[in-house]
């Protein structure tokens, strides 16, 4: 892709329609702050890779958005989320000469190369993300009668959110000659969800039944033992009388 000086490009316009008909597959997407499967999942890895190449080439970023949730394939503060209609990556050729952006992919790896006149860029750029803070998740509580009263189940453990400020450092002849803020990013925390039980304790009822069953068995056993003793006593008495009767005769 060639850009003349001053040309502005929209990532979404270049990609076009995201659908099965245009070759996109199902993968993980973030919708309303939640992870789910959708057509075109993973497209943000492409926009993020391009974004980092643009920053390192010191091209002008017109529009960029971070993801609503933390992602794990690049440093936080260096991602570029896209979503047709409300999130785009736009950039401009702010050099004095045409530039060419090349894309190389082999099925496992994607590379972007920005080619231009070396006279426009006689320095290097470094990307420096800086974490400003950690935001703890709030706690949401729901109730369920399918869980015994007094018990609490953690339905979702929750995740921290983060705020970042990202800088670019311009390095010339081994020295930092400029440090400039290029973006701010905020990643929303994911709530911790607890389910509090309001139902009856089935375990307690089971224990009562077990105890009643035990008592019944114990009583029955005791009765049998008593009957056995009475029977033995009666037999002993009978044998004793019989023996005495024989002796007398």
Over which residues does each language-model region extend?
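Well-ordered beta-sheet/strand-loop patches within structured domains
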Residues: 1-249
């Amino acid at each position: 892709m060639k850009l003349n000086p001053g040309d502005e490009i929209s990532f979404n316009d270049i990609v076009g329609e995201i659908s099965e008909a245009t070759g996109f597959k199902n993968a993980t997407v973030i919708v309303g702050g939640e992870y789910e499967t959708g057509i075109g999942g993973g497209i943000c890895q492409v926009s993020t890779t391009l974004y980092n190449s643009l920053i390192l080439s010191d091209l002008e970023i017109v529009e960029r958005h971070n993801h609503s949730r933390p992602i794990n394939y690049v440093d936080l503060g260096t991602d570029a989320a896209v979503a047709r209609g409300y999130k785009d990556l736009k950039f401009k050729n702010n050099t004095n000469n045409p530039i060419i952006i090349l894309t190389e992919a082999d099925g496992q790896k994607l590379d972007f190369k920005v080619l231009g006149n070396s006279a426009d860029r006689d320095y290097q750029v470094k990307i420096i993300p800086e974490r400003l803070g950690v935001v703890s998740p709030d706690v949401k509580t729901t109730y369920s009668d399918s869980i015994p009263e007094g018990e609490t189940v953690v339905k979702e453990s929750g995740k921290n959110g983060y705020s970042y400020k990202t800088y670019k450092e311009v390095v010339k002849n081994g020295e930092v000659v400029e440090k400039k803020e290029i973006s701010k990013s905020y990643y929303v925390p994911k709530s911790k969800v607890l389910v509090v039980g309001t139902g009856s304790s089935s375990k307690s009822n089971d224990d009562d039944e077990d105890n009643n069953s035990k008592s019944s068995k114990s009583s029955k056993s005791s009765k049998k033992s008593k009957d056995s003793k009475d029977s033995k006593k009666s037999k002993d008495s009978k044998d004793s009388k019989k023996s005495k009767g024989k002796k007398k005769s």
